[in-house]
Amino acid sequence: MRKFFGTDGIRGIVNEILTPELAYKLSRAIIGYFKDVKKKKVIIGSDTRNSKDMLKSALIAGFTSGGMDILDVGVVSTPSLSYLVKKYDDVLLGIMISASHNPVEYNGIKIFKSDGFKLEDNVEATIEEYILREDDYFRASPREIGVIYNFTQALEDYKNYLKEIIGEDFRGYKIMLDCAFGSLSEIAPTVFKELGAEVIAYNTNYNGININDNCGAVYPEIGRNLFLKSGAHIGFTYDGDGDRVIAFSEDGEIVDGDVLIGIFAKYLKERGLLRGNKIVGTVMTNLGLEEYLKRLGIGLIRAKVGDRYVLEEILKNNLNLGGETSGHIILFDYMPTGDGLLTSLFLLKILKERGIKLSDLAKEIRIFPQVHEKIHIKDIYITEEDEKEFRGIAEEVINGKNIRYIVRKSGTEPVIRITVEGDVPKEDLTNIALEIKNRIIDFLRRSKRQDLPSKGVS
């Protein structure tokens, strides 16, 4: 089991798990791993958390001590950093300091290669070994120590790239944006305005501690209330680092990632642009989307949860569309990672081209009810045998009913996530999910003897 890297880089509570010492050791370990590579520049960006400067300083100290120059792009979205790393030929890596949708107590470090993709699992594992080894890796001579460059103007390249992809004038559209006090707080309203839309933007005045605080893509019901108040034609709510988005149709309905993928799949197929006639979802992808795709003659490949695993399947099967219920959508012809701003622009492009409302497209996809529960498991190591036991508990509770379930340990938080789904009343699913949750808590209490929350409390 890995000590530092999860499904999306290194992530944890700041100054408990993710410390400046760890950030420094990480950059020194990267110096050791890439010691024979001639490229000597690293792009560093972050979301808006107050811990960004502390972690950035530690990373920069490690990189510059090894002779790496730093291109500091400031506050950026994760997908924009991925784009910039690929665009500039002399850049070795991109470092994104962000914990995505997590609250401000968390932060994370994501590493991108020069092709814009995240590091492979085996490379992360080797770098982790280097961290634990604590060797004093290469140090540059005084004349060769790296320097820091302000590179914030590079965001203009990303902005222009998005506008080039869309190629539309959105005059006449009134757009609501919930920017979650995160990375898209400035650039998202600007891009929509430059394309002619009238923009009503909420949650843009970030202060370092309000990122994702009862706002953004993790809280779509709150975003829906903002949308209804705004009087806009369509709304979008992003997460803290801008790699996911949830939409709101003109009638106030929440349009999640599964529905967005269905809309994009149909649009691309009708134009002969859907590569392989398949798309990639995850184990969480709603059965309603799967049935809709079948009617269109489109296949669905289910990956593990996490946009990196969606991308793996896209690459393995030579496809160009994939995503998650949470709103990570990969439009691979344009971007190798989920991009909330690109996704929202692309959706509006479709609506304008077709002269149609979002509700008209969304209602074609009947999403089955889902219920989610979670169990906090701080400091509890979950084994494969435990996970097998969880599945057995779920199957016993469901008892042959036509209900799909997923029980899994989160790759980004210390929780076990439980999802049940089926074409049955939501109340039935809620009862089943709670029963599974309570039985798993009982099992963990017996087997791990840990102080877990009481029954029914997540």
Swiss-Prot record:
Cofactor(s) this protein cannot do without? Mg(2+)
Q: Where does Mg(2+) bind?
A: 100, 239, 241, 243
The UniProt entry's GO biological process terms, in alphabetical order, are: carbohydrate metabolic process; peptidoglycan biosynthetic process; UDP-N-acetylglucosamine biosynthetic process
Which keywords does the record carry?
A: Isomerase, Magnesium, Metal-binding, Phosphoprotein
What is the enzyme's class at the highest EC level?
isomerase
Pfam families assigned: PGM_PMM_I (PF02878), PGM_PMM_II (PF02879), PGM_PMM_III (PF02880), PGM_PMM_IV (PF00408)
Positions where Phosphoserine occurs in the chain: 100
The record's GO CC annotations read: cytosol
Q: Which residues form the active site?
A: 100
- Could you tell me the EC number(s) of this protein? 5.4.2.10
How cofactor binds (record note)?
Answer: Binds 1 Mg(2+) ion per subunit.
Modified how: Activated by phosphorylation.
Q: Which InterPro entries match?
A: A-D-PHexomutase_a/b/a-I (IPR005844), A-D-PHexomutase_a/b/a-I/II/III (IPR016055), A-D-PHexomutase_a/b/a-II (IPR005845), A-D-PHexomutase_a/b/a-III (IPR005846), A-D-PHexomutase_C (IPR005843), A-D-PHexomutase_C_sf (IPR036900), A-D-PHexomutase_CS (IPR016066), Alpha-D-phosphohexomutase_SF (IPR005841)
Q: Which reaction does it catalyse?
A: alpha-D-glucosamine 1-phosphate = D-glucosamine 6-phosphate
Spell out the molecular function terms from Gene Ontology.
magnesium ion binding; phosphoglucosamine mutase activity; phosphomannomutase activity
In which domain of life is the source organism classified? Bacteria
Protein task: Catalyzes the conversion of glucosamine-6-phosphate to glucosamine-1-phosphate.
Family, per the entry?
Belongs to the phosphohexose mutase family.
Record-linked PANTHER family? PHOSPHOGLUCOMUTASE (ALPHA-D-GLUCOSE-1,6-BISPHOSPHATE-DEPENDENT), PHOSPHOHEXOSE MUTASE
> What is this protein's name?
Phosphoglucosamine mutase
Which species? Dictyoglomus thermophilum (strain ATCC 35947 / DSM 3960 / H-6-12)
